[in-house]
Design a protein with these regions (language model features):
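Active-site/acyl-donor-binding loops of N-acyltransferases
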Residues: 1-9, 14, 67, 135-161, ...
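A conserved beta-strand-loop-helix scaffold within acyl/acetyltransferase catalytic domains
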Residues: 6-56, 60-74, 121-126, 131-149, ...
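Glycine-rich, N-terminal phosphate-binding loop and its surrounding beta-alpha-beta segment
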Residues: 59, 63, 75-123, 127
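Aromatic (often tryptophan-rich) hydrophobic motifs at membrane interfaces
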Residues: 79, 96-107, 218-335
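Short amphipathic alpha-helical interaction patches enriched in hydrophobic/aromatic residues
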Residues: 88, 205-209, 296
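Conserved beta-strand-loop-alpha-helix junction that forms the acyl-donor binding cleft
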Residues: 119-129, 294-303
Length: 354
């Protein structure tokens, strides 16, 4: 265990839900996966933990961990998804704060609780190389040989007409086709809209015969528990034949995240998905959101979606790769428990695919 540097202190599980959301919105790197609702729905209230790091009494970093323990032995894992949060809004981010918060996380969950700590920070390969050094110096190693997934980040600080001009020619043509259709946009955050979207999403999943990467019903429950200012944005596109496309986006911090998209069988010719994405960008611009994360690309396994997102991002879209997951542990029992649990989960997943 290493003490935090002078002037820094940490607190664990000393914050209530309402206060957590107030703190969450103070960080530019805040996101859906660090919301109280996400952790509670995914793991249950008893299995989430909240850590604060303070400098001279002022909160400068926070992290929500999801705790999973093996029965009886008490060993297990603490997982920080898309965290910790340490980049303040409207102020320069300090890498030293990142050091202090991952040290505090390690002190609590590795040293005090004997868990395997795994973090998935919002850091990219093209970020300063100092972060890899900090992670190593604070006792973290990359989780196996795993490297992070790729995504495309759009900079929304440019004028709207410049963003439109940056769209690749194919995307511009499809958007013009959609704008000539008699399409109606329905938007909001109500549960009724989520239900309509799920019906369309399930139809698309069945048509394309692919396995859902995320449990859409789980996200609906999360939406019901999120406070108004943190709820996901739902946008639906209706043609004369009915609902033709939809999307769900999360805006908690300075980066909007594209979570789900769907197109109905009858709506495939309307190009509604192009119109929705552009209307979403207009809405994000009005809210002064700085960036739009198109949330995952894989040219090999999903070339169609990759092309759609690449063309939307345009020549100035930032194609980035996350640094990946990092972990730290001092307990052989926790390492063994997590390894067995993940192996069983992988086997169960393989059996479900058959």
């Amino acid at each position: 265990m290493r003490k935090l540097d002078g002037g820094y202190s940490s607190e664990v599980d000393a914050v209530e839900e309402k206060e957590w959301y107030r703190l969450l919105h103070q960080f530019d790197d805040a996101n859906m996966y660090q919301t109280w609702a996400y952790g509670q729905v995914r793991n249950g209230r008893r299995n989430i933990s909240h850590l604060l790091v303070k400098e001279q009494g002022r909160v400068i970093a926070i992290a929500q961990s999801r705790i999973v323990k093996a029965p009886l032995v008490g060993a297990g894992i603490a997982y920080v998804m898309w965290g910790p949060l340490w980049r303040p809004r409207e102020a320069r981010a300090d890498a030293e704060v990142f050091r202090q918060v991952i040290r505090a996380l390690r002190n609590e969950y590795v040293c005090r609780r004997g868990l395997l700590l795994r973090i998935y920070p919002i850091l990219f390969d093209d970020d300063s190389p100092c972060f890899l050094s900090i992670l190593a110096e604070e006792g973290f190693t990359r989780a196996g040989d795993e490297h992070g997934s790729r995504t495309i980040i759009m900079d929304l600080n440019r004028p709207l007409d410049e963003l439109r001009q940056a769209l690749r020619p194919h995307w511009q043509r499809e958007l013009k086709v959609a704008e000539k259709q008699k399409l109606e946009i329905v938007e909001g955050s109500e549960d009724e809209l989520f239900e309509i979207f799920i019906d369309m999403y399930r139809e698309m999943v069945a048509r394309k015969k692919f396995r859902e990467p995320n449990d859409i019903d789980e996200f609906r429950t999360i939406q019901q528990r999120l406070p108004v200012e943190s709820k996901m944005k739902i946008m639906l596109c209706r043609s004369s034949e009915g609902m033709c496309s939809g999307l769900i986006c999360s805006v908690v911090g300075g980066t909007a995240i594209y979570l789900f998209g769907a197109t109905s069988t009858t709506g495939m010719k309307s190009r509604g998905s192009y119109l929705l994405q552009w209307k979403l960008i207009e809405w994000l611009k009005c809210g002064r959101v700085a960036r739009y994360d198109l949330n995952g690309i894989n040219p090999e396994t999903n070339p169609g979606t990759y092309k759609f997102k690449r063309d939307l991002g345009g020549d100035k879209g930032r194609d980035v790769r996350f640094l990946g997951r990092f972990e730290s542990c001092e307990s052989i029992v926790s390492v063994a428990s997590v390894s067995v649990g993940e192996r069983l989960k992988s086997i169960a997943g393989s059996m479900m695919k058959k």
